């Protein structure tokens, strides 16, 4: 899951997968 934002990345990571 690619997100353009730190908060977005963390939020998506909860139900998508950690980007960092």
UniProtKB/Swiss-Prot annotation:
The keyword rRNA-binding does not apply. The keyword Cytoplasm does not apply. Residues 1-10 have a biased composition (Polar residues). Keywords: IgA-binding protein, Lectin, Mannose-binding. Belongs to the jacalin lectin family. Alpha-methyl-D-mannoside and D-mannose specific lectin. Binds IgA. Tetramer of four alpha chains associated with two or four beta chains. This is Agglutinin beta-2 chain isoform 1. It comes from Morus nigra (Black mulberry).
């Amino acid at each position: 899951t690619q997100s353009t934002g730190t908060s977005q990345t963390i939020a998506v990571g909860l139900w998508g997968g950690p980007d960092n």
